[in-house]
Curated annotation (Swiss-Prot):
Gene this protein is translated from: zapD
UniProt similarity note: Belongs to the ZapD family.
Organism in which the protein naturally occurs: Vibrio atlanticus (strain LGP32) (Vibrio splendidus (strain Mel32))
Compartments (UniProt record): Cytoplasm
Gene Ontology CC: cell division site; cytoplasm
UniProt cross-references to Gene3D superfamilies, sorted A to Z: YacF-like, YacF-like domains
Pfam families, A to Z: ZapD
GO terms classed as biological process: division septum assembly; FtsZ-dependent cytokinesis
Quaternary structure (record): Interacts with FtsZ.
InterPro entries in the record: ZapD, ZapD_C, ZapD_sf
Keywords assigned: Cell cycle, Cell division, Cytoplasm, Septation
Job of this protein: Cell division factor that enhances FtsZ-ring assembly. Directly interacts with FtsZ and promotes bundling of FtsZ protofilaments, with a reduction in FtsZ GTPase activity.
Protein name as it appears in the record: Cell division protein ZapD
Amino acid sequence: MITHKFEHPLNEKTRIYLRVESLLRQLHLSSAFSDAQQYQLFFRSIFDLIEIFEQIQLKSELAKDIEKQRVTYKSWLDVEGVDQEMLTSLLNDISHIYRELMQAERFGQSLKEDRFLSAIRQRFNLPGGSCCFDLPALHYWLHLPLDKRVRDAETWMDSLQPLYEALTLWLKLTRETGHFKDQIARTGFFQSDADEANILRLSIPMQYGAYPMISGHKNRFAIKFMSFETGQACTQDIEFELAICS
């Protein structure tokens, strides 16, 4: 059975985390500059990240969440039935990533101070603003040898490595708290309690031709399935899998 998967955040902080994860993924995928257009995705991802960093103290928020996870997992030490070797290894990983995070610069600081990035950032977001007459510095950079451009990209991405590792860990551990369970949306509608959840994960069979519209918060949520063909609410029962992740 072919399915499609959705994730939905149940609070604003997690919403930002998922956006940053998506931007970091785009950044890594486009950093090889294997075709002439990848640089647009690469720089747009960098500038979108800088904008997020300017709006929220992401480093301090993420540090608090990583520490909260460490305290939770530490409480499982010496608990019967828990793999203590695996738990100790995980706690060591969390502690290492937390230390690296706390020692890192404010997210995006070196990117904002980079002369080349600063020179192209403002005009890059203009419609069609990446033309050579709008951004001659970018046009010159694009004609540098590929290995030079890749080295520059690696330098910019290296400054985000503590963020990447910490965010990847937090989201991984958060997702692992939820287990997919079979559910039925009667006449295309489903609602339930969430109990301090951060993320909903859905797996939906493609055969229904439907996608979810989700609303809610950390304690309660509702899912309304919409027909892709008509844009109207589904009236049929829809079987799907749901994981509620805390």
